[in-house]
Amino acid sequence: DDTSMTLALMKSLIDNKGFNPFDVQDNFLAWRDDVCFSYNGCFDIGVTTYKALEAYGEDKTTPFTGLTHKMSAGNGSIMRLSPVFCFYSKEQEKGRYVAVEQSKLTHAHPLCLEYSLKCADVVYEAFNGKLHQDILSQKGVHRDEVWSNGYVVNTYKAACWAISQTDNFKDALILAVNLADDADTVGAVTGMFAGALYGVESIPKEWVDSLVWSKEIVEGVELLYITGSDRRSNILTRRGWKHYELTS
């Protein structure tokens, strides 16, 4: 679900040349119901995300159907954030705003909004080659003190810890996913931070080449950055993530 929702958000930002919450939600529903943005369908979806999409599907008058109850402070909205910062790489305040707004689609708990904003701050500082204070504060933390479950606070801290203990993309990711528990999302957030800090060249080529739709994803990310920079019109398909037409 981490990758699928990331691709769904990425496509919407490209197609709309910015954040369109209704379109993002429609993409999320297409992933859940129509085998889109996933090679083999929606095989995993969080309870909070499912309930939010259910509410949106029943009444599409508002896209902001994120849950707010005390048990809904999960990590489902920070795991998909990376396209926002790639698109708004040169517009920090817009990026910070959209980071929070996209969370409200499925995860509207105050902690989810707060930590979406924290992720924005970490990434934008990393773009400038700086380590956020939340990463620096994790340097002396022992592995036994790190929790890697689905609670948004713990996921964020685990990702900061993995960055603090390493000095390159590969080692940060390996350390993060080996924390176990909610390994995919801790890895996704760590990858977002590490990618911003070390750059795309730091990602092992063999990892990229082994991905399903590797070429399409790489081209999509390039389009995302270009579109965010000049708002050029590009079209990607929803179904199967096939990249079939580019217009400018």
Where are these regions (language model features)?
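Structured, active/binding-site neighborhoods that engage oxygen-rich ligands
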Residues: 1-248
